[in-house]
């Protein structure tokens, strides 16, 4: 599944700047930030990336979520995110507090907008799901990175 998605992205002309297929919940591929508009054209129905800029650059990424796993109940201090379900269906829990709400199911083509600091959790359902995401950095002097994560709860003890 992971290599097929990677090859698919390359066939679209995307440059993959990093990847990690060893996460307990699945994995991700990071796309060259200079291709943010092309990424949006392919995965976000051509949404103008200039309308997404909050305080800095944009970082496109693909998440591949294994079936029947939950990512951390988490939030970010230096980014907001916009997601588009690309393949399959996925569960998502969202809240403005540490208390988890009910899971909502999103299908291919559905878009989700997460605010900076909003708690969220992706949940794999019956099959793999692929979610395109764009990080909307909120601090241009200190852009978000993989360390910008506050885990409120994590099934994997991280």
Give names to the regions the model predicted.
Residues 1-58, 149-158:
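A short, N-terminal "cap"/entry segment at the start of jelly-roll beta-barrel domains
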Residues 44, 61-79:
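Conserved short histidine dyad/triad with adjacent acidic residue
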Residues 58, 78, 116-118:
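Short, surface-exposed coil-to-beta transition loops
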Residues 64, 96-120:
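Short acidic-glycine-tyrosine-enriched beta hairpin
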Residues 66-67, 77-97:
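Glycine- and acidic-residue-biased ligand/ion/polar-headgroup-sensing regions
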Residues 71-74, 83, 92-94, 114, ...:
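Short beta-strand His + acidic residue motifs that chelate non-heme Fe in jelly-roll/DSBH
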Residues 79, 91, 98-100, 129, ...:
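Short, surface-exposed beta-strand-loop junctions and turns on beta-sheet-rich folds
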Residues 121-158:
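Double-stranded beta-helix
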């Amino acid at each position: 599944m992971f290599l097929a998605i990677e090859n698919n992205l390359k066939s679209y002309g995307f440059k993959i700047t990093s990847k990690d297929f060893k996460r307990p919940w699945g994995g991700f591929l990071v796309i060259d930030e200079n291709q943010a508009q092309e990424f949006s054209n392919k995965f976000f129905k051509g949404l103008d990336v200039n309308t997404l800029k909050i305080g800095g650059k944009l970082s496109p990424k693909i998440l591949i979520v294994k079936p029947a796993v939950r990512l951390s109940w988490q939030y970010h201090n230096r980014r907001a995110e916009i997601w588009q379900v690309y393949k399959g269906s996925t569960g998502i829990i969202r809240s403005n507090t540490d208390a988890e709400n009910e899971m909502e199911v999103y299908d291919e083509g559905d878009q989700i907008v997460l605010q900076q600091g909003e708690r969220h959790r992706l949940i794999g359902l019956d099959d793999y799901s692929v979610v395109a995401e764009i990080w909307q950095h909120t601090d241009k002097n200190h852009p978000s990175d993989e360390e910008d994560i506050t885990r409120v709860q994590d099934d994997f003890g991280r």
